[in-house]
């Protein structure tokens, strides 16, 4: 896990600064095909990259809306995956809306995963793992069980959130669900999740199944590697790629 911090101090929610004792975590996804953290977190800190539209959430009311979450998970400018804390954990966020029984804003830490096209398995695996590790870390420091982690659509069913589908529209596309997510968070808690150091990558002894990749060859000349890549793609492996090694 890589955890950075850029508090959205210009957001109205942050300025309001209402205290909150976390009793759970609510997982969201952004609902737009843009995996880049800079779309939501800003200004550029040297890692995020420049948002030329300036439409990040570090403004009073992003897009005219009263919205803010405690963390975003997505892609850095260099292509790496990271989590960004954007509100103090024990401050009320504006992420859940309201249901028949109230609002999870008063009880739950809100985490947004930046969506892509929803079809990239490698991106999904990376942000899924990052989210599980962040949730396990938060469960440990606040003494929460893995069962306290829900998504927005589950919050709606419980009557504590507005009617949204996230993340139930995305996870099943990759063989996952909130049930498997909570199980992975529970396993991370059981092995003793390592608290993160801001600005550093933390290697977690994770029991979450790894993704296994196949290398077909290594060549001293790029042309030879490219020729093999073309043969592999012609055979139907359209997601094959070249990577320069040493």
Predicted regions and their residues:
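Basic/polar, cationic surfaces and motifs that engage anionic cell-wall
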Residues: 1-7, 15-21, 102-109, 114-206, ...
């Amino acid at each position: 896990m890589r955890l950075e911090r850029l508090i959205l101090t210009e957001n109205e929610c942050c300025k309001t600064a209402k205290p909150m004792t976390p009793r759970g975590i609510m997982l969201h996804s952004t609902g737009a095909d843009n995996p880049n953290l800079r779309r939501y977190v800003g200004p550029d800190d040297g890692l995020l990259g420049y948002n030329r539209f300036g439409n990040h959430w570090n403004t009073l009311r992003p897009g005219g809306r009263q919205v803010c979450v405690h963390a975003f998970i997505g892609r850095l400018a260099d292509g790496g995956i990271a989590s960004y804390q954007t509100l103090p954990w024990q401050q009320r966020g504006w992420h859940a809306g309201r249901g028949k029984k109230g609002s999870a804003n008063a009880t739950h830490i809100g985490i947004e995963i930046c969506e892509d096209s929803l079809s990239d398995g490698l991106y999904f695996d990376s942000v899924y793992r990052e989210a599980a590790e962040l949730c396990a870390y938060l469960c440990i420091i606040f003494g929460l069980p893995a069962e306290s982690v829900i998504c927005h659509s589950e919050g709606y069913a419980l009557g504590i959130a507005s009617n949204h589908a996230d993340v139930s529209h995305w996870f099943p596309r990759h063989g996952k669900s909130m049930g498997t997510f909570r199980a992975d968070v529970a396993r991370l808690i059981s092995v003793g999740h390592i608290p993160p150091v801001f600005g550093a990558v933390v290697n977690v002894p994770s029991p979450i199944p790894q993704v296994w990749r196949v290398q077909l060859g290594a060549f001293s000349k790029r042309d030879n590697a490219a020729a093999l890549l073309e043969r592999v793609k012609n055979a139907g492996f359209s997601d094959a790629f070249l990577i320069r090694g040493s």
